[in-house]
């Protein structure tokens, strides 16, 4: 589904939306989004992912992140995103584009849980935010495939 359709989606069906970069960042000067300009000058952009967050239950981030690029959201905003239950940070850039990724998790223990107010790790409970940030996750797929499919 497109980013515009995602924002207008009001049904209870599970849907996914693969956001293009132009949907979640904007040029600070108000100029039209240009991918090459964003790659060369990421500091000239700000995130506007917030407009998607109230509709999002699970956020999966798998993009390259330059430290000069904006974070996708601010830690302090997590409390506002009540629908958000799980963040899967495939990139696992600690304190990077996903500011709730405070440490990597492991294949054996893939999730940790954060209190939405304090952002401290807590035991799992209904209001906690689950974070999956396995730093070697992309390398596990070939390993699993080799075991399962020989």
Regions found by a protein language model. Give the residues of each.
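Short, conserved loop/helix-junction motifs that constitute active-site signature segments
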Residues: 78-83
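Feature representing long, continuous alpha-helical segments
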Residues: 58, 67, 85-86, 132
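Charged, low-complexity, helix/coiled-coil-prone segments
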Residues: 18-29, 84-98
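General structural feature for long, well-ordered alpha-helical segments within catalytic domains
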Residues: 45, 52, 73-74, 149
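Glycine/threonine-rich flexible loop motifs
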Residues: 65-73, 98-99
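Dinucleotide-binding/catalytic capping subdomain of oxidoreductase cores
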Residues: 1-68
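Adenosine-phosphate binding glycine-rich loop
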Residues: 86, 91-150
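Residue-level signature of transmembrane alpha-helix interfaces in integral membrane proteins
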Residues: 73, 77, 105-107
């Amino acid at each position: 589904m497109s980013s515009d359709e995602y924002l207008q989606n009001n049904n209870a069906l599970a849907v996914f939306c693969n956001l293009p970069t132009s949907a979640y960042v904007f040029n600070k000067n108000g100029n039209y989004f240009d991918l090459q300009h964003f790659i060369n000058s990421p500091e000239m952009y700000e995130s506007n992912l917030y407009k998607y967050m109230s509709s999002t239950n699970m956020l999966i981030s798998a993009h390259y992140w330059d430290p000069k690029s904006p974070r996708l959201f601010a830690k302090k905003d997590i409390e506002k995103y009540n629908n958000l239950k799980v963040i899967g940070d495939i990139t696992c850039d600690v304190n990077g584009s996903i500011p709730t990724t405070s440490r990597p998790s492991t294949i054996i223990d893939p999730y940790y849980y954060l209190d939405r107010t304090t952002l401290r790790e807590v035991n799992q409970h209904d209001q906690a935010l689950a974070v999956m940030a396995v730093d070697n996750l992309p390398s596990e797929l070939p390993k699993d495939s080799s075991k399962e499919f020989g």
